[in-house]
Amino acid sequence: MIALGIEGTAHTLGIGIVTEDKVLANVFNTLTTEKGGIHPKEAAEHHAKLLRPLLKKALQEAKVNIKDVDVIAFSQGPGLGPALRVVATAARALALRYNKPIVGVNHCIAHVEVTKMFGIKDPVGLYVSGGNTQILALEGGRYRVFGETLDIGIGNAIDTFAREIGLGFPGGPKIEKLAQRGEKYIELPYTVKGMDLSFSGILTEAVRKYKTGKYKLEDIAYSFQETAFAALIEVTERAVAHTGKEEVVLVGGVAANNRLREMLKTMSEERSIKFFVPPYDLCRDNGAMIAYNGLRMFKAGIRFNIEETIVKQKFRTDEMEVTW
């Protein structure tokens, strides 16, 4: 069977085409800015402009005709309303035009589910991106959130810090390079509340320290990463201990960070559990993960009426019953 998935929850538009065990195409285009963040309206305009050429490119790469596709999947949420609506409208149009079934996919769940293409069975997922930071795992037929950010996502915190010091967007790779040259640890707020996290405090203090001119930028970047990532590892380790699961996966755009990978790998080795990171094109926001999750849902008998494809900006991870 073949599924086509459309992702567009934030600044990346992605279209993926997959079978049960293979990615046939996974193409994307990301809206970037030199200064400032991403405006929802700009993201929607970006997606609308590029949907048709990106769809054509995906079909060409996969060497399939749209008529060969068995199901259309799309990211139903959570995300930016205007961007989500562009994607949902496109998915509905394809489904109606070619008489194909359609399914809406939870973006956060898809990030973890795509690891099952690589033999992962039942992991604890550390999902780290711009808008989301969650520690989640399947329990009682739903993906339960064992810990999450109480304010901003770790990726958003890093990008905002980069923007405040004039590095532009996206800031993750730039901050990571600076951090690699850091030599001195500077104390920054470490905020873990129960199983939840907060990154607004560390962001504010890092910017304040930078503006004093008393600290090397490389040292601030290094300390920012070490402190924030240690908090992520702590909560992930607690979730592993609570659930008794023997696999940990790292997903989301921030999974590209080598220091975070290294820290999570060390924790996994100390607990003698499996650690896995998908190829980066399947870590970041992408259409293939939406297609894969949609195909699993479709094979389990899940079908959506067009009326049920309304987008959900605040689509909770534990809102969806997992029957596939």
UniProtKB/Swiss-Prot annotation:
Residues at which Fe cation binds: 107, 111, 127, 285
Origin species: Thermococcus sibiricus (strain DSM 12597 / MM 739)
Cellular compartment(s): Cytoplasm
Keyword vocabulary terms for this entry: Acyltransferase, Cytoplasm, Iron, Metal-binding, Transferase, tRNA processing
Family affiliation: Belongs to the KAE1 / TsaD family.
Cofactor note: Binds 1 Fe(2+) ion per subunit.
UniProt name for this protein: tRNA N6-adenosine threonylcarbamoyltransferase
Oligomer status and interactors: Monomer. Component of the KEOPS complex that consists of Kae1, Bud32, Cgi121 and Pcc1; the whole complex dimerizes.
Binding positions (substrate): 127-131, 159, 172, 176, 257
UniProt-listed Enzyme Commission number(s): 2.3.1.234
Gene Ontology molecular function, alphabetical: iron ion binding; N(6)-L-threonylcarbamoyladenine synthase activity
Coiled-coil stretches noted in the UniProt entry, renumbered to this chain: none
Pfam families: TsaD (PF00814)
GO biological process: tRNA threonylcarbamoyladenosine modification
UniProt function note: Required for the formation of a threonylcarbamoyl group on adenosine at position 37 (t(6)A37) in tRNAs that read codons beginning with adenine. Is a component of the KEOPS complex that is probably involved in the transfer of the threonylcarbamoyl moiety of threonylcarbamoyl-AMP (TC-AMP) to the N6 group of A37. Kae1 likely plays a direct catalytic role in this reaction, but requires other protein(s) of the complex to fulfill this activity.
UniProt xrefs under InterPro entries: ATPase_NBD, Gcp-like_dom, KAE1/TsaD, Kae1_archaea_euk, Peptidase_M22_CS
Reactions accelerated catalytically: L-threonylcarbamoyladenylate + adenosine(37) in tRNA = N(6)-L-threonylcarbamoyladenosine(37) in tRNA + AMP + H(+)
Name of the gene this protein is made from: kae1
Cofactor(s) in the UniProt record: Fe(2+)
Record's GO cellular component terms: cytoplasm; EKC/KEOPS complex
